[in-house]
A protein has these predicted regions:
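Eukaryotic protein kinase
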Residues: 1-175
Length: 177
């Protein structure tokens, strides 16, 4: 999935497959924490989520060093950057950032100095201009800085179904602006 700029049918297949994978791991009580293009392999056109190296079980107590953040800056959810608890919403944020890259071919929070990228993430300022306008509202909603504002699995899947049928992916989500 690192190549980006997938055509709509392939984008739907990858985004939907990744959404189903996240639903399965969340159902098992696991949070991946590092959903990004480099951790999604395409096998016969189907996404496979890899690298559970920093994943954790949702009920586990975290043993981390204060101030240490692990991950790729443009794909770290705001709550990871600020040291807050991670939840399934953290992975939905990573899903949206990864899907935005696949849809537009560019990282949604840009490139450049780590501090600048992290600031754009924390402020919820993705650049989705290269993304198909039919899926942009879903990605924008899932990239909300506040985890409580992000859509859940069933909302994501319903919005993706709208997108797959040529309609805007807004039917099942509230669009924040």
């Amino acid at each position: 999935a690192e190549r980006g700029l997938l055509p709509p049918g392939e984008l739907y297949r990858v985004a939907h497959g990744l959404a189903e994978a996240l639903d399965a791991i969340h159902g098992a009580g696991v949070i991946h924490r590092d959903v990004k293009p480099a951790n999604v392999l395409l096998v016969d056109g189907e996404p496979v989520l890899i690298d559970f190296g920093i994943a954790h079980v949702a009920d586990d107590v975290r043993l981390t060093m204060a101030g240490v953040v692990m991950g790729t800056p443009g794909y770290l959810a705001p709550e990871v950057i600020s040291g807050q608890d991670v939840t399934p919403a953290t992975d939905w944020w990573g899903w949206a950032a990864t899907t935005a890259f696949a849809a537009g071919g560019v990282p949604p929070f840009g490139r450049g100095a780590m501090s600048a990228v992290l600031a754009r993430v924390a402020q919820g300022e993705p650049d989705l201009r290269a993304v198909d306008p039919r899926i942009e509202p879903l990605l924008y909603a899932a990239l909300a800085p506040d985890p409580a504002q992000r859509p859940h699995h069933h909302e994501v899947v319903a919005a993706l179904e709208s997108y797959a049928h040529g309609a805007p992916a807004t039917a099942a989500i509230e669009v924040r602006r």
